[in-house]
């Protein structure tokens, strides 16, 4: 919806594009439905302030007025190529992440089940290397197709070139340089569910689900997430997002000896991730609920 802002110029009300639904206005919006569309449009925007907005679950709007162009990567390709037990699936940046997870499971392509119900679009997934319940995007990312604003060209980077880390990638280091166009995932027709994460095993047992069936694992994950967070369509929120501390292995081991129930996870040879927030919330060490004023 167009209106007028403090710059005395036509703007678009984009409040509905973010899951927090905070006031958000931009001077223009450009919907990108294909790679060809990107190649034609982007050179003209080389010096224009721009903001990429996909599913809007990673965006907290602090300044309601953006004097620039909002880019909406709505590319919808879904191209599988099967090689033996492996399936290489190229997915457009505009696909819903959760819908992609469920579609792959229904097709019999496995690996993403632990990442069910993560909000947002496919294009954001490699930027911060999304992860949950013991699985990260890097475990199943084969390559990413990007538009490089510096080179003004479409390029491809293999997963090994993206420098994936804990909620990190080179795309996160250079947010103004790259626009994700498609992500190629490497999945398998042979299920290998990962249910070692305690909450999943407990939820599978509680519901009488089968730990060897990926779709059942996804159902358990969805139940866990739904119990923790409201539907953003009903109650605006940005989902469950936090980053646990990464410490040296020796420090993690000392803390583990003192607090045996505290979960840890290796992050390279010298460091471990401490799942402090999971531990606090799950074991009742942080039970207080806060209600912040909005508006």
Model-predicted regions and their roles:
Residues 16-19, 154-295:
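Phosphate/pyrophosphate- and phosphate-bearing ligand-binding catalytic cores of soluble enzymes
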Residues 3-150:
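Anion-binding (especially nucleotide phosphate/pyrophosphate-binding) glycine-rich loop
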Residues 1, 54-59, 101-102, 176-177, ...:
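Short, mixed-charge, low-aromatic patches
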Residues 1-10, 105-119, 174-176, 180, ...:
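Short N-terminal signal/transit or membrane-insertion segments
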């Amino acid at each position: 919806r167009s209106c007028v802002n403090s710059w005395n110029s036509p703007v678009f009300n984009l409040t509905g594009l973010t899951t927090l639904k905070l006031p958000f206005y931009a001077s223009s919006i450009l919907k990108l439905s294909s790679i060809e569309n990107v190649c034609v449009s982007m050179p003209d925007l080389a010096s224009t302030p721009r903001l990429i907005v996909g599913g809007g679950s990673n965006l907290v709007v602090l300044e309601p007025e953006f004097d620039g162009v909002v880019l909406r990567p709505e590319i919808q390709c879904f191209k599988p190529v099967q090689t033996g037990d492996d399936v290489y699936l190229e997915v457009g940046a505009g696909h819903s992440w959760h819908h992609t997870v469920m579609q792959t499971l229904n097709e019999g392509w496995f690996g993403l089940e632990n990442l069910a119900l993560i909000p947002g679009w496919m294009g954001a997934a490699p930027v911060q290397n999304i992860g949950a319940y013991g699985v990260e995007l890097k475990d199943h990312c084969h390559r990413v197709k990007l538009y490089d604003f510096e080179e003004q060209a479409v390029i491809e980077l293999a997963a090994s070139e993206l420098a994936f880390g804990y909620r990190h990638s080179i795309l996160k280091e250079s947010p103004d340089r790259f626009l994700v166009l498609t992500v190629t995932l490497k999945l398998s027709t042979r299920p290998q569910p990962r249910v070692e994460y305690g909450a999943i095993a407990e939820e599978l047992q509680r519901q009488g689900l089968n730990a060897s069936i990926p779709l059942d694992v996804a159902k358990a994950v969805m139940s866990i997430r739904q119990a923790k967070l409201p539907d953003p369509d009903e109650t605006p929120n940005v989902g469950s997002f936090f980053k646990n501390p990464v410490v040296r292995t020796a420090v993690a081991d000392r803390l583990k000896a003192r607090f045996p129930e505290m979960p840890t996870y290796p992050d390279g040879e010298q460091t471990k991730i401490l799942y402090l927030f999971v531990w606090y919330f799950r074991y009742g060490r942080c039970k207080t609920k806060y209600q912040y004023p909005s508006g």
